[in-house]
């Protein structure tokens, strides 16, 4: 195992790709990374750290779905990731598959936006453009009310996360959209050519 070593993005990306072959899971990871980087910049935090943790937060989901978060902890520890990174990565599953309650702003942000990225993706995909570039807060809020729309998205987790962060739901949605717009091409939501 060795001494903890701060991972680089290329190392994190290689690990993500080794354990996740699914295009949709990889795109979700890129989306969460993009939002985490956006939020880190906005808050004057370490963008690289926030982004890397966003990138690998679902590391175990494809190969070990019944051990989600538990296996991520093991895998990251095997690769000598710092305990702070490991805890942050598994905190997004608090109350579902992890006992690590989000404490830091990084952890609270990851907890809040993980599910929200799914709602933004689904909102973008029903638009004629199929682009996140023209998704607005009001579009997501309109879909938010319809519990059948993106029914798998746990809206109560998103609301709880916004409260933990001390932001309004509108602000959280806006930050999520902006972060995803920054990585629109990587997540396949740049849209159809006009």
Task: Annotate each language-model stretch with its function.
Residues 1-64:
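Acidic/His-rich, divalent-metal-binding segments that scaffold phosphate/diphosphate chemistry
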Residues 7, 11, 27-31, 67, ...:
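Conserved active-site and cofactor/substrate-binding residues in soluble primary-metabolism enzymes
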Residues 13, 17, 30-37, 70-73, ...:
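Predominant activation on well-ordered alpha-helical scaffold segments within soluble catalytic domains
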Residues 18-22, 103-106, 166:
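Active-site oxyanion-binding pockets that recognize sulfate/phosphate
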Residues 20, 132, 138-194:
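C-terminal binding/interaction regions
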């Amino acid at each position: 195992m060795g001494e903890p070593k701060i991972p680089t993005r290329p190392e994190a990306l290689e690990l993500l790709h080794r354990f996740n072959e699914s295009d949709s899971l990889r795109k979700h990871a890129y989306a969460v990374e993009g939002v985490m980087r956006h939020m880190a910049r906005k808050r004057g935090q370490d963008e690289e750290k926030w982004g890397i943790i966003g990138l690998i937060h679902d590391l175990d989901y494809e190969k070990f779905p019944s051990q989600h978060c538990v296996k991520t902890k093991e895998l990251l520890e095997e690769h000598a990731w710092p305990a702070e990174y490991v805890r942050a990565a598994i905190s997004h599953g608090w109350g579902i598959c992890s006992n690590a309650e989000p404490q830091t702003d990084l952890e609270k942000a990851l907890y809040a936006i993980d599910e929200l990225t799914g709602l933004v993706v689904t909102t973008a995909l029903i638009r004629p453009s199929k682009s996140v570039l023209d998704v607005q807060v009001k579009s997501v809020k309109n879909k938010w009310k319809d519990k059948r729309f993106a029914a798998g998205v746990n809206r109560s987790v998103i609301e709880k996360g916004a409260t933990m962060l001390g932001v309004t739901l509108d602000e959280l949605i806006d930050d999520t959209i902006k972060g995803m717009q920054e990585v629109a091409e990587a997540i396949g939501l740049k849209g159809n050519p006009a």
